[in-house]
């Protein structure tokens, strides 16, 4: 296969950034501030932060992207709900917020009760792991809008999250050179880069085929996104955390969402999961593209004072694999050292 990028697969993240900027610029003209409600952090971060009568609340919304297509191909629907909750819960904790409640929006080509029940199973499991209930939602039947890989099976799934911050929100502005970067291991691909992963893997394998490392394509593509609420909340209780990055769309470049005037050096990153190397080799995907598309083994990063880093690792490791993956220094961008190679982003 000739060299393939996320853009070649149909997703242009640079174009997306311009589109978001266009939306944000228009919405700025219509901004209102209700009595008793003040915007503390707005469009651009992982979640908005609102001060409502003295309480700091967060709001965010996200979906699971083209992972729904894999669910349709496989005929398995009980995992994508976990992803939908995870994407939102993990974004909320990046501001230091504990999720309070979720809403879901399910748009379907045909509202099959059995499929809906499977999707709800995943939503329920995810919400329980995140420690907050699903308090409402919307089911829309849109046969002219939603088209599936399998006739009648098309759907899209979106979740919104309400959270609460105790103390000051964590925006990343306190990150400084000398800080340590603690990485939290991902469970796999999670919910970003699925379009590229799916197109590369399915160019060579059937969705039920076994990959060289023993897992099937379906298992890798549908592996649920890990939910990091519990370990992060425990760390926030006992240690100073200066920035939290959910490694989603854009890969490790998400670190730059915290402060973009410092350099994040990953000199001891996690070994990527085997599926990432298969995608890279099979799709002839440049290493730089891999790190700006996928999480490459790290689902979340905590920026903490260097002297607290080992204790933070010990705390997180009670829940999920963690280690010090790098540090912050003077400069700009993200640098990854992997197998003797240096990747600059």
Curated annotation (Swiss-Prot):
The keyword Nucleotide-binding applies. Its EC number is 6.3.3.1. One of its GO terms (cellular component) is cytosol. It catalyses: 2-formamido-N(1)-(5-O-phospho-beta-D-ribosyl)acetamidine + ATP = 5-amino-1-(5-phospho-beta-D-ribosyl)imidazole + ADP + phosphate + H(+). GO terms for biological process: 'de novo' IMP biosynthetic process; adenine biosynthetic process. It is found in: Cytoplasm. Belongs to the AIR synthase family. HAMAP family: AIRS. This is Phosphoribosylformylglycinamidine cyclo-ligase. It comes from Methanopyrus kandleri (strain AV19 / DSM 6324 / JCM 9639 / NBRC 100938). The lineage of its organism: Archaea, Methanobacteriati, Methanobacteriota, Methanomada group, Methanopyri.
């Amino acid at each position: 296969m000739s060299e393939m990028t996320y853009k070649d697969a149909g997703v242009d993240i640079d174009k997306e950034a311009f589109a978001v900027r266009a939306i944000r610029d228009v919405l700025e003209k219509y901004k209102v501030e209700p009595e008793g409600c003040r915007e503390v952090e707005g469009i651009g971060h992982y979640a908005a932060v609102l001060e409502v009568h003295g309480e700091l609340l967060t709001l965010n919304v996200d979906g699971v992207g083209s992972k729904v297509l894999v669910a349709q191909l496989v005929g398995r629907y009980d995992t994508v709900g976990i992803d939908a909750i995870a994407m939102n819960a993990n974004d909320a904790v990046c501001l230091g917020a504990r999720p309070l409640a979720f809403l879901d929006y399910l748009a379907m080509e045909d509202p099959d009760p059995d499929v809906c029940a499977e999707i709800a199973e995943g939503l329920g499991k995810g919400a329980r792991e995140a420690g907050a209930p699903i308090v409402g939602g919307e089911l829309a039947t849109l046969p002219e809008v939603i088209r599936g890989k399998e006739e009648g099976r098309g759907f899209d799934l979106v979740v919104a999250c309400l959270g609460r911050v105790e103390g000051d929100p964590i925006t990343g502005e306190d990150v400084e050179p000398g800080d340590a970067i603690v990485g939290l291991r991902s469970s796999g691909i999670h919910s970003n880069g699925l379009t590229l992963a799916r197109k590369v893997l399915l160019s060579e394998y059937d969705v039920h085929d076994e990959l060289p490392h023993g897992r099937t394509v379906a298992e890798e593509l549908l592996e649920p996104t890990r939910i990091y609420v519990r370990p992060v909340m425990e760390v926030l209780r006992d240690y100073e955390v200066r920035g939290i990055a959910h490694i989603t769309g854009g890969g490790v470049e998400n670190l730059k969402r915290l402060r973009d005037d410092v350099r994040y050096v990953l000199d001891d990153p996690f070994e990527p999961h085997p599926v990432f190397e298969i995608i890279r080799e099979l799709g002839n995907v440049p290493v730089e593209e891999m790190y700006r598309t996928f999480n490459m083994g790290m689902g979340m990063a905590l920026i903490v004072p260097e002297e607290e880093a080992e204790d933070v690792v010990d705390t997180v490791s009670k829940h999920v694999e963690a280690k010090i993956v790098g540090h912050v220094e003077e400069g700009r961008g993200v640098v990854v050292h992997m197998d003797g190679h240096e990747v600059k982003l």
